[in-house]
């Protein structure tokens, strides 16, 4: 099955700053610390579906 595009949203402000290719068969949501240009700092970003 092909990879599916999902967005990574900032947990602080809620903006969707990054898109990634992810396997749709995973049950857990990806969590990564990345830079949010709206908050101006590194924050936790979670996968949205």
From Swiss-Prot:
GO terms for cellular component: cytoplasm; ribonucleoprotein complex; ribosome. NCBIfam families: PRK00504.1 (NF001764), PRK00595.1 (NF001860), rpmG_bact (TIGR01023). This is Large ribosomal subunit protein bL33. Keywords: Ribonucleoprotein, Ribosomal protein. GO terms for biological process: translation. Belongs to the bacterial ribosomal protein bL33 family. The gene is rpmG. It comes from Lactiplantibacillus plantarum (strain ATCC BAA-793 / NCIMB 8826 / WCFS1). One of its GO terms (molecular function) is structural constituent of ribosome.
